[in-house]
Amino acid sequence: MDAFSLKKDNRKKFQDKQKLKRKHATPSDRKYRLLNRQKEEKATTEEKDQDQEQPALKSNEDRYYEDPVLEDPHSAVANAELNKVLKDVLKNRLQQNDDATAVNNVANKDTLKIKDLKQMNTDELNRWLGRQNTTSAITAAEPESLVVPIHVQGDHDRAGKKISAPSTDLPEELETDQDFLDGLL
């Protein structure tokens, strides 16, 4: 016998046993089978009631006027309050900096949308965030001003002269503590 025939025979035997159990059921089997049917009927009626109580879906029209990423129905009240506070802060900052045109347009709206943020360049975003004296392009002179670490192989250089420790801007108390800890090492 192949595997398919064996499975088929086993299914048939199982179904026959189940039929015999149903035919020759004891009173307690009948009772519990009846209780299970009643539970299933209640569950199906509750599901039907839930399907009928399902709220009507919103139209697609609102998605053209609201940004669904920023909107959360559970925190709509909090968002409204936050938008008012942010709008006031933004207007105060704009009064200080009148040269930002895109930022002015955003401040006049009730809600800030992702589309508005994407349309702003870095200077406008920095003005909107309230950052001052920021540049939008990195100059080539900045990498040269980085501090290059000094690799010291000991207290003496190759010529045998003692190398002085690099000067730091630490207070004297911290320097003494640092010297003490270096001595322990």
Curated annotation (Swiss-Prot):
Listed GO CC annotations: cytoplasm; nucleus
Location of the region described as Disordered in the Swiss-Prot/TrEMBL record: 1-71, 155-185
Note: Present with 1100 molecules/cell in log phase SD medium.
Biased composition annotated in UniProt, kind: Basic and acidic residues: 1-18, 26-47, 59-71
The name this protein goes by in its record: Uncharacterized protein YER034W
Feature: compositional bias, Acidic residues: 170-185
Acetylation listed as a keyword: yes
Keywords linked to the UniProt accession: Acetylation
Organism: Saccharomyces cerevisiae (strain ATCC 204508 / S288c)
